From Swiss-Prot:
GO terms for cellular component: membrane. The gene is PSS. Keywords: Lipid biosynthesis, Lipid metabolism, Membrane, Phospholipid biosynthesis, Phospholipid metabolism, Transferase. One of its GO terms (molecular function) is CDP-diacylglycerol-serine O-phosphatidyltransferase activity. It comes from the Eukaryota. Gene3D superfamilies: 1.20.120.1760. It is a peripheral membrane protein. One of its GO terms (biological process) is phosphatidylethanolamine biosynthetic process. This is CDP-diacylglycerol--serine O-phosphatidyltransferase. Its EC number is 2.7.8.8.
Amino acid sequence: MKMEPDEVSSLRKHRFVGTDNSILGRYVLHHYTNWMLEKIPAFVAPNMLTLCGLIAMVASLALTLAFDPCLCSPPAFLSLANFLLMFVYFTCDNLDGAQARKTGSGSSLGQLFDHGVDSCCALITSIALSSTFGFGLSPKFLIFTLAVMVQFYLAGIEEKFTGRFVLGRISGASEGVVFAMGAHLATFLCGKRLFRHLFSDNFLWPVKKIYSSILGTDNFSAVSVIIGTALVFNTASTLISIEFKMHFPRRLLLYSTILRVMSFVTSFVILHNTLSTESLWIRHLNILMFGQIFSIKYVNEVCSYIIRRDPFLFTPPYLMYLTVSAVLQLQYLKEFRETLVAISFLLSSMYYLLVALRIIITFKEALGISFLSITTSDKSKAGG
């Protein structure tokens, strides 16, 4: 990744502008973060805290896929482990920015790394929660995962096109994560039948009845239409909010960006359904590959906002995924599905790691700072 002089200048001048309007953030988490911040030594780099949060969530993913691969029957210890690991991630995610301000070592590299880690953790959160809710690898899992991922992506899009990262009164980063932790803990304490009952059609019968009369069929789950309705409403309201803050030429760029994302999401849905009769591990690889490419796409949006140029980092794996999704619909290639998905996942993983490493090195060298440690020069350059 080569940067032109004007892009380096944009990188050095960039300052993160964020507003947390969430209720929990303002009245609870702010005090918790300040209390925890007093326990963190000044030599601990913000990116190290971010990395610790990522490690905790990767551990959560590994445990979930190992002990509940079907995402429908989590053992009690798994729910407790996911609660504790998410609590570690949540704490680190709140502390990294505060530590950067405390030590004067904030940078655009830190912002990009934090957003990149959060984009990975969005998928991991949806997988762990699907296990806790007992969704399985069903349409409920699919729509829930897409709801989490799309809403997360829209927050990044809003930052790119408006110049501000704004968390609403009820935000996924605060209330959403606390709800997820509460769900894991409740399942550990009350058992896995809790959410199976709460999300059943019998419990949600009023919703089932209303939507059955609207759709003319009852061949759906009530919780799926609730999630789907929330997804459509939040997506529409977010796009309208962004539009009001933009000029017309920028709107065309906005919708071309959204179109690429929707084509990718559509390919994921198609391939997920195509692989429904294949081995569990292949279905897992497809989900993880979707998460990798989604993360690259999200990081690309943040990166383009920071350096004022779209580097199109996502293009190779994006085109590969669309091609694989289309090719595997051919019946005579059915016996090669597992091989093609496995190879695609391997290539996507290699590309993902190389892109992440290249971005970190490029930004680090352009800014003249360290990545996982704090030096005197880091503070002076962050301040300048």
